[in-house]
Amino acid sequence: GRPERAGELRDALHLSRPGDLPGPAGESYLAWQRAAERSVSVGSLHRALPRLAPERIAEWLDAGSAGQGGPVARAAMVVEGVLRDAPRAEASALILADAALAQSLGWDHLVPLLAAGLKRADLRKRGEELYLACHRALVVGAAEALRLADELARRAAQLRAVTPKLRAKGAGDAVEMFLTRDAVAPRALPLPDRAARRLCDRLVDLGAVRE
């Protein structure tokens, strides 16, 4: 639902200063983060999309589950239903579609598979055209998710391997933050400012993180 790529959405939030408003791109990133970090439910989705009433979220998800077809068909119906009722809510439609897909597949958490593969032009499609676009998007999104999972596993292993070389007090807690977050600013680490910056520089020098 946004023209920015995933990294640009992330940077819009993490490169902002304390007290700054995140802006549309940062808000989109926060919505996805909140939607994915908890088990899929109407409550967790409302937390991610506070402008949508829980009742509306439930209606869209229920309408998708009432239709014929499998998980992809349900997700396509959710996209169509949300954009029919709220034509500008593209980000919300994608989040709820991936939530519907996760529910249909029995997953606890949503994975942004459709969002990774659907193009803006696809969101203007309806019926069979949208259904086929969702199938194509799922193939693209699943391949990208597998590639990213492999990359993250390798990077996490590398970060754990260099942890014993870190002497700063609190380095273990800092490393845990790097392992569980997409990006971490030095000021967010549980260390004094100078120590946090030195630790980040050390991790970059060791090739364990990227600046």
Question: What is each residue range found by the language model?
Answer:
Residues 1-211:
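FIC/Doc superfamily catalytic core
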